[in-house]
Amino acid sequence: MILISDATLRDGNHAIRHQLSAAQIHAYARAADEAGIDVVEVGHGNGLGGSSCLLGQTPISDRLMLETARAALRTSRLGVHFIPGLGKAADISLALEIGVDVVRVATHCTEANVSARFIEQTRAAGRTAFGVLMMSHMAPPDALLAQAKLMERYGAQAVVLMDSAGYSTPSLVRAKVERLVDGLDIDVGFHAHNNLGLAVANSLVALEAGARIVDACVKGFGAGAGNTQLETLVAAMEREGHDTRTTFERVMTLARGTETFLNPKTPHIQPANIASGLYGLFSGYVPHIQKAAQEFGVNEFELYKRLAERKLVAGQEDIIIEEASRLARERDVQRATGGVRVRELSA
């Protein structure tokens, strides 16, 4: 099973000058938990101890951010980003005290040696430690493997390659991830940025190459051109048969819910357009499908699925109404029969 680490409440902070509020953190963490996200990463964009005049000051402390998220999470694990030098051992101690589950110790891709004491500190407390190699485009595969091996030796349970500049192309990602997968005895992860419009493609290639962890943010909410868009990634992963704890429909619900309390402004693809792509429907049908779903009071995404089964082509708008009406009738019969689905009755 692929682990999804959601950096919306950490990398997303970069996009708004680190101004996430406690209310936003609580609302998103609760929604991500309900959506089945594995790890919810929280904090200043630069991680624990990052709030400063130089890097940008947060309106609330690391303690309050983490306590707020901890209180909202039930099944998702709470994660933090930590850069040695910006953060101190005391910052990790605070995070562990509050109940952080995953500490991601991040260094420049050629400076893994500075991660040792912090990985060891995390493991000694019985928590999960990931190593993160930032700006990974700046080192060739063999050099990255050597650095990752150091993190593995220190006790890291996974190493994540971070394409911090959004520089990488699929061929570069494949070569580097394959090298780490072949050379390590721990899991490999990948964190993409979308500067070249390749974040989802690069993440899929990383998975094909053997990565078991992918990072993403709702609506691509993150630094610069944004991160891998969570909704698009999950849709593409479903198409490719990757197993996760969440589903496309659950992350769609998560993304739409953020419009009331987060509403990221980073460039992203709308949920309805992702659905039309996932199910192979003509893009021009989207407003018609949304209107029909609203008029008949049916689930929009179930309607996409039904229309995909009909293999619609352009010019068949009438079938949208037909299928929406059928879904509404099935719903009414289901209610009348105490929850038995119409398709089950006719099977």
UniProtKB/Swiss-Prot annotation:
Annotated positions binding Mn(2+): D11, H191, H193
Catalytic activity: (S)-4-hydroxy-2-oxopentanoate = acetaldehyde + pyruvate
SUPFAM superfamilies to which the protein is assigned, alphabetical: Aldolase, post-HMGL domain-like
GO BP term, pick one: L-leucine biosynthetic process
EC number(s) from the headed UniProt entry: 4.1.3.39
NCBIfam families reported in the protein's UniProt record: 4OH_2_O_val_ald, PRK08195.1
HAMAP family linked to this entry: HOA
Protein name stated in the entry: 4-hydroxy-2-oxovalerate aldolase
Species of the source: Burkholderia pseudomallei (strain K96243)
